């Protein structure tokens, strides 16, 4: 993004966590990385793991208010809903969750169906920033409703972005569930869509270094039209998440179809 969306969030500070014994990885050196490998199928919304944004927005560019009422799980699917509903000073309500812990180098994966509608942003990303007394570092997958045939990839390092890359989503990101993953290492980031490598970053100046939280969000704008398209609301729409997983560097992969599993198999051949 071009705006530090999350400067207003209250955050907890955590200590670093070591990976498996005997596996000295760069992740161990990331200050504040206390999150361990996990997989969440969203049978329920575990609020010990997830913080639900509620009662605010991130600035004038956002035309909706985060509301916990827009966040729920249904039949093993996390649903974040955008709809016309006045909440505080906004006429629309939207949903967001974030992990309570921070995560470092490893493989991040989510199976997602994006929302419909120009002017909307369906996002799976990691973020840390000034509210946590850290520089703004961020790694993004964002489906912009104006063109759901693509997913925008991006990184921020100390609030410097401008690294946008558009990757194809065969069949459309809003037509069914697709798998998005990135492998974050000290010296590179690899991005995958449905198990296929679509983008790789190796410039050290473009690779974040600070441990971050995992976010899912669905929000809209009336003003960022060049980027997200002209806002056009027709009916309530949802960002749906079937699964999310994090595999720390050096840990075993979390599920059979995981990109981390694919990379493990490739290394053993």
Swiss-Prot record:
Keyword check for Manganese: no
Cysteines paired by S-S bonds: none
Location within or outside the cell: Secreted
Keyword set includes Hydrolase: yes
Active site: 138 (nucleophile), 142 (proton donor)
Span of the signal peptide: 1-29
EC number: 3.2.1.-
Principal place of residence: secreted
Pathway connected to this protein: Glycan metabolism; exopolysaccharide biosynthesis
Keywords recorded for this protein, A-Z: Exopolysaccharide synthesis, Glycosidase, Hydrolase, Plasmid, Secreted, Signal
Gene Ontology cellular component list: extracellular region
Domain GH16: 40-252
Record GO terms (molecular function): hydrolase activity, hydrolyzing O-glycosyl compounds
GO BP, sorted A to Z: polysaccharide biosynthetic process
Protein purpose: Cleaves high molecular weight succinoglycan to yield LMW succinoglycan. Dynamically regulates the molecular weight distribution of succinoglycan by cleaving nascent succinoglycan only during a limited period after its synthesis, perhaps before it undergoes a time-dependent change in its conformation or aggregation state.
Recorded family membership: Belongs to the glycosyl hydrolase 16 family.
Protein name, as recorded: Endo-1,3-1,4-beta-glycanase ExoK
Organism annotation: Rhizobium meliloti (strain 1021)
Record gene name: exoK
